[in-house]
């Protein structure tokens, strides 16, 4: 698997560079808990465990990485940011995508009023375009509340799946 700053999906893991060090990450898919673990090149590891499901623990994990790497604790490690533009083929992304890890979860995408919107893990969200087929998933009521990053995979002009961190959602509405 390649080593690069942008995360690379590695069969359930994500691998990337942070401040020149290789990081391998995984998040848990168990109902009722949120977990994220990472191995940092140099023999370090860290894990965040939360007893509430579908909670974004990224920022806490980043604090751990920053401490290990000697970076300012508030340093963010998002690899995609909204660019203010609109995706040219929104109709290709519309649909119901499902992941079947433990309890099935859905990522439902709709094109409404000139915006990609929908439901992600039972939350009302908007999808803000970052470039290529990558979107920031944000809370519909508060766009400063980043929930996840989505990368859609297209074939023949239609999304067959979407990756949200280390989870792959496949089109359910064939």
Map each language-model feature to its residues:
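Catalytic loop of the DD-peptidase/beta-lactamase superfamily, centered on the K-T-G motif
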Residues: 1-174
């Amino acid at each position: 698997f390649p080593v690069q700053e942008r995360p690379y999906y590695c069969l359930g893991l994500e691998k990337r560079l942070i401040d020149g060090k290789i990081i391998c990450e995984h998040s848990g898919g168990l109902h009722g808990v949120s977990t994220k673990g990472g191995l940092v090149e140099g023999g370090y590891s860290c894990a965040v465990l939360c007893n509430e499901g579908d909670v974004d623990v990224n920022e806490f994990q980043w604090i751990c990485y920053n401490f290990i790497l000697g970076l300012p604790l508030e340093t963010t490690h998002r690899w995609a940011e909204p660019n203010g533009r609109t995706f040219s083929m929104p109709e290709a992304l519309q649909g119901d995508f499902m992941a079947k890890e433990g309890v099935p979860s859905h990522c439902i995408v709709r094109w409404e009023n000139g915006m990609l919107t929908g439901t992600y893990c039972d939350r009302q969200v908007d999808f803000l375009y970052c470039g290529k087929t990558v979107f920031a998933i944000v809370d519909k009521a508060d766009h400063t509340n980043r929930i996840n990053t989505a990368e859609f995979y297209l074939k023949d002009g239609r999304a067959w799946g979407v990756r949200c961190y280390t989870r792959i959602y496949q089109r359910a509405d064939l």
